[in-house]
Each structure stands twice: as C-alpha cells, then as structure tokens.
Regions:
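Short amphipathic alpha-helical interaction segments
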Residues: 32, 56-67
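Active-site gating loops and adjacent loop-to-helix segments of metal-dependent hydrolytic enzymes
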Residues: 42-58, 99-108
Length: 119
C-alpha cells in the first residue's frame, strides 16, 4: 500500500469509497506495523466473510468494495496489526485469509494492566 508520508513513521493511505477522501493511516515503529483503517468495514460479521457486501452509507459502493478487498488482502498477507471502527473489542487485531476471497477477524489477546502500588 502506498500513500503520503505525513511524518516519519506515519503514512496516509487512500481508502476511497466509503466517503470521498476516506483515509487509512499506516503507523510503523521499531519494526512493528499498524493500519488504522477507519470505516473500511462496517459489519465485521458480514464483510470479512463477504467483502463484496456494501452498506447504504458507502458513497461509492463499487470503490468501497474494491478498497476493502485490496486492504483486507494486503493486511492478511502482511500479518500487520489492524485497528478501526466497528470491530469487536478490543478493536485491534489481525486479518486472516481463507484463500477463497473470504477473511476473518482475529482480535489480539487483551489483559488489563495490574495495579501499580504507591511506593
């Protein structure tokens, strides 16, 4: 995925379709990568398994579908972390491909931090 580098480690990536100018942000630090994709997926239970499904709020449904397919494919291949709206708690995880054009969401493991005692 290509885009404009905003500052070192943060790149704006075109994610057109949902709205004009919809943008994802690729963040990289110390060899780790995260894509914050905004509203790329609206109904995770449907659109991971069937990325060709659009919703009423996509201004350009054909472009939204093409963008979703492209980014899902890239994220599954790269195994990078993904964060975005409309994803199950904790809202950050990985995309897994099934090899048949369908995907699944794999959230990261979440555990609360232990309380730090006053010293």
């Amino acid at each position: 995925m290509e885009g404009s580098i905003l500052v070192p480690g943060i790149q704006a990536v075109k994610a057109n379709g949902h709205t004009p100018g919809h943008t994802a942000y690729a963040v990289e630090s110390e060899g780790q990568k995260l894509l914050i994709w905004g509203d790329l997926v609206h109904a995770h239970a449907v659109q991971f398994a069937r990325p060709g499904v659009s919703i009423e709020y996509d201004i350009d449904p054909k472009q939204a579908i093409a963008t979703r397919r492209s980014i899902l494919k890239a994220m599954a291949a790269s195994k990078s972390l993904v964060a975005g709206m409309h994803l199950p708690f904790p809202g950050i995880g990985h995309v897994r491909a099934d090899g048949k054009g369908r995907y699944s969401w794999v959230p990261i493991e979440f555990a609360p931090l232990s309380k730090v005692e006053n010293q």
